[in-house]
Amino acid sequence: MDLVPLKLVTIVAESLLEKKLVEEVKRLGAKGYTIVPARGEGSRGMRSVDWEGQNIRLETIVPEEVALKILARLQEAYFPHYAVIAYVENVWVVRGEKYV
């Protein structure tokens, strides 16, 4: 069994950004993604009302060069304007050809 080193990019953002973020990560080279609801508390505190919408957690496994493109786009277009965080982890995957 061969394991392939890749990057797991995780983006936590306002749910209203879901469609736009999916389009961006795919355009930048991601072959797929997973989205789940997210909640918690950070530097902006907890949201006090539901009408503001929920957060989502978008995860995608990509080669390093794609991860860097995604992070650069987030920094340029999203971080200044929206409640968005992102982080990258090293992962080793089976069937790595599905991700490159």
Give residue spans per PLM region.
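Positively charged, small/polar-rich N-terminal and surface patches that mediate targeting and assembly
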Residues: M1-V100
